[in-house]
From Swiss-Prot:
GO cellular component entries: viral nucleocapsid
Protein family membership: Belongs to the rotavirus VP3 family.
Protein name, UniProt field: Protein VP3
Lineage of producing organism: Viruses, Riboviria, Orthornavirae, Duplornaviricota, Resentoviricetes
Annotated stretches, region: N7-methyltransferase activity: 171-245, 429-555
Length: 835
């Protein structure tokens, strides 16, 4: 949802939009809670409070102040990610298709012939990093840019088997126009760009697990972050390959040679980072015009020094000349060298050309060895061709996509490789590598060993759920790592499946109860965004590809109502009960009935079950931004840091009742996942709360009324306001609590409406209006370690007779309390209190 804050109402009516006017009788937190549970996507928030907007944004719900109709129209028609700390909005708006254009934020693409393969009459527009060049389109009170581009489709095309670019793009654009927006993927770059600078300020040692090409620009500014990926393809790994011939397959209709060069250099940079944790000078021989240098410099400041007879316009220092062996001495330490020398074929026949290429390959390799043989802190990436070669077994083979699969591949070498054992690799084996293997990731660092690290902050986004990881190792890492941000796939199945298929692999599934943590926030993507200064207009949907975001060691842990809080907890319930259910009271009715409380009069006002916990369980797929376990735990140890005003603290028994209702709901829905989740949450409540039951009580609290509107034959009709199991020396503590609650007890709005047979031989009158006070008293007794209440639900009633009588219904009557007392069962009154 998105909240657009206005000072005045607007005449225009918008679809899927609701107006909320700030309620001055409620505090900012309650207003935020009410807004978050509205069911439309767009909320026009009138007479707004900036504090309420802050609360919503911290909760991950985008809430923006609007100063003009132009701002309103722009934000209401599309989704966006909001950097609420810096007041920057990143639109995810593809309406530019109506201008017959596709967009890119990679400059090199604009220098290709891609426009020849677009839809008829369409053009390509460069919009800068994350759409920064579009800022000039919006003259708004906040900074605004459109981060939507088609780079994801262009890159997907490059790695796909498709060759016809126009048909590929047409299909993908149609898919984009007919399916739900993958909002998390679109905003992920914004998130990463906010996350890692934030972590870098706090933590000296950061580990990042499983980065992909989408992150290749983000980490250029963080050479000290230790990356873990799937490891490199080594020369020695070719032993598994069978020999093949030249394939000559075209990969892309438009020229992607620059993309290949960019990927080679960035791969080399990250390999260098892994060895030396600092930025290198980048030397490049050949590969002009290297327009992609512009893209790299948009993200991070590097020195590029290049040699090529052709112009290289974005190089820091360009030598418009050939590079020779003698020039190697000019190259300094703390550098990488990219050798991409290849003479043009011109009119040479293939035999003559093949001889030239092989000679050049040997020459290139010699340059690489010469560069690495002296000095320190060096890495080299060199162009090679498929031919009979002796290569170091530890050298890394690269084959990033290029326009055609021919004879070309690249070799990545460090200073240790050149002194390592060499192996003869036949030409046919290298052709097999070229024909069958694509380097899909610029990150070729070794795999992560799933174990805790005492002095490092571990980030593992979408990296550890794969079933080739041991599930218990992942759980143990999350349980024991002191500082981390780790995601795992949430169990969205209805049959409690332990793993689910994703693309061509399987992922383990998890619930929050799989983890035994007491210093972690477990939330959703949008809940995590709020913690790092971002919010989003489109919440996570239960697609089956959703992840739990688990933060260990965050300073936000105790701020219970600010981050990963209960905002939106009832939104799914509202959507269902106001549109599909038998009555809008269905949730209240079901919760009472499933706990054998059959007095439904005023059930929506006085419910015996925690609606928070119930909704958090049965609709966890929709509202798991709320960290239920943390909420339970912090209340159990009385360390919840509550900033808001009015805040209702549940008694632990209310939470148990909610679990019982959720379990019955799950059985009716045949939802085995909710059934397990509710059982495990109930066990967790019993674990963190020391709940004892007065199932064999020796004292009770009685409430006597001035007048009872029914006939009775018991001696003193009274409301048993809870039973206790206490020793006599605890009586002063019990009476103190009763006295402390005197005002609230006598101010209870106690009513009765009918009589009924509670059991065979027990005729009673119903009582309403006392439950909230009962649960408050329960909490006070619990905190004083006094056993109060039974394991079965408290059903307030007045016993009228121990014989069978017919039910009597009357107009609701308010009962006036005469006295409240503490009496020993089958004994004397030990305390009596009148108003």
């Amino acid at each position: 949802m998105k909240v657009l804050a206005l000072r005045h109402s607007v005449a225009q009516v918008y679809a899927d939009t609701q107006v909320y006017t700030h309620d001055d009788t409620k505090d900012n937190y309650e207003n935020a809670f009410l807004i978050s549970n509205l069911t439309t996507h767009n909320i026009l928030y009138l007479n707004y409070s900036t504090k309420t907007l802050e609360i919503l944004n911290k909760s991950g719900i985008a809430a923006v102040e609007i100063q003009s109709l132009e701002e309103l129209f722009t934000l209401i028609r599309c989704n966006f990610t909001y950097d609420y700390e810096n007041n920057i909005i990143y639109l995810h708006d593809y309406s530019y298709y109506t201008n017959n254009e596709i967009r890119t934020d990679q400059h090199w693409v604009t220098k290709t012939d891609i426009e020849e393969y677009l839809l008829p009459g369409w053009k390509l527009t460069y919009v800068g990093y994350n759409g920064s060049d579009t800022r000039g389109h919006y003259n708004f009170s906040f900074t605004c840019q459109n981060a939507a581009t088609d780079d994801d489709l262009i890159i997907e095309y490059i790695y796909s088997e498709a060759l016809d670019f126009q048909n590929f793009m047409l299909k993908k654009i149609k898919e984009r126009m007919t399916t739900s927006l993958p909002i998390a993927r679109l905003s992920n770059r914004v998130f990463r760009d906010k996350l890692f600078p934030s972590l870098r300020k706090k933590y000296q040692h950061i580990v990042n697990v499983g980065p992909r090409n989408e992150s290749m620009f983000t980490f250029l500014n963080f050479p000290s972050i230790k990356q873990f990926s799937n490891g490199p393809y080594l020369v020695k790994d070719t032993i598994k390959l069978k020999q093949e011939r030249w394939l000559g397959k075209r990969v892309s209709q438009f020229d992607i040679g620059q993309y290949k060069n960019m990927m080679n250099v960035i791969t080399t940079v990250y390999y260098y980072y892994n060895l030396y944790q600092k930025k290198p000078i980048i030397y490049m021989v050949g590969s002009a015009p290297s327009y992609w240098i512009y893209d790299v410099k948009q993200y991070s400041d590097f020195t590029f020094e290049t040699w090529d007879p052709l112009d290289t316009p974005y190089s820091s220092i360009h030598h418009k000349e050939l590079f020779f062996e003698k020039d190697v001495a000019k190259l300094r330490d703390n550098s990488i060298l990219y050798i991409d020398i290849r003479t043009d074929r011109r009119n040479a026949d293939w035999r003559e050309w093949r001889k030239t290429v092989e000679e050049q390959t040997i020459s290139n390799l010699k340059l690489a060895y010469q560069y690495l043989a002296s000095g320190k802190s060096k890495v080299c990436c060199v162009k090679m061709t498929a031919m009979d070669l002796e290569l170091p077994i530890s050298a890394k083979l690269l084959h990033h996509p290029t326009t055609e699969i021919r004879s070309e591949f690249y070799l990545l070498l460090d200073i240790w490789d050149i002194s390592n054992v060499k192996r003869f690799i036949p030409k046919g084996v290298l052709y097999s590598f070229i024909n069958n293997i694509i380097t899909e990731n610029v990150f070729i660092q070794p795999p992560f060993k799933i174990k805790t690290s005492k002095n490092e902050y571990i980030v593992a986004l979408y990296a550890l759920s794969n079933d080739f990881n041991d599930r218990m190792n992942v759980i143990n890492l999350i349980n024991n790592q002191k500082q981390s941000l780790i995601t795992v796939r949430i169990n969205n199945t209805f049959k409690d499946e332990p793993k689910v298929g994703f693309k061509n692999i399987y992922d383990w599934t998890f619930l929050p109860t799989d983890f035994n943590t007491t210093d972690s926030i477990i939330t959703s993507y949008d809940g995590c965004l709020g913690i790092f200064g971002l919010s989003i207009s489109l919440a996570s949907k239960p697609t089956g590809n959703n992840h739990l975001f688990i933060l260990n060691g965050t300073d936000k842990y105790y701020k219970l109502d600010q981050f990963a809080n209960h905002t939106g907890i009832s939104r799914r319930s509202h959507q269902i009960r106001f549109s599909e259910s038998a009555t809008s009271y269905s949730g209240y009715i079901f919760r009472d009935l499933s706990n054998n409380n059959f007095n439904l009069i005023g059930t929506n006002i006085e419910n015996s079950v925690s609606g928070h916990v119930y909704n958090a369980l049965i609709y966890y797929r929709y509202n798991y931004s709320f960290d239920l376990k943390r909420w339970i735990y912090l209340h159990s140890i009385e360390k919840a840091d509550i900033e808001g005003g009015k805040y209702y603290e549940h008694a632990p028994i209310e939470l148990i009742y909610a679990c019982r209702s959720a379990k019955e709901f799950a059985l009716l829905q045949d939802d085995l996942t909710v059934l397990r989740y509710a059982n495990e949450i109930e066990r967790y409540i019993h674990k963190v709360y020391s709940i004892t039951y007065a199932d064999d009580p020796n004292y009770f609290i009685g409430i006597k009324f001035k007048h009872i509107p029914y006939k009775y034959d018991v001696k003193i009709p009274h409301l048993t306001f809870g039973v206790l199991f206490i020793s006599d020396n605890m009586i002063p503590d019990v009476t103190r609590i009763i006295k402390d609650m005197k005002k609230e007890l006598f101010e209870m709005d106690v009513t009765t409406s009918y009589t009924y047979m509670l059991s065979d031989g027990t005729y009673v009158a119903n009582i309403s209006g006392v439950l909230s006070t009962y649960f408050k008293m329960y909490n006070l007794f619990y905190k004083n370690q006094i056993t109060f209440g039974q394991s079965r639900m408290f059903i307030p009633h007045i016993t009228l007779s121990f014989s069978s009588r017919k039910t009597v219904r009357i107009e609701t009557v308010k009962l006036k309390i005469d006295s409240i007392y503490l009496r020993k069962i089958r004994g004397d009154t030990v305390f009596d209190m009148s108003e």
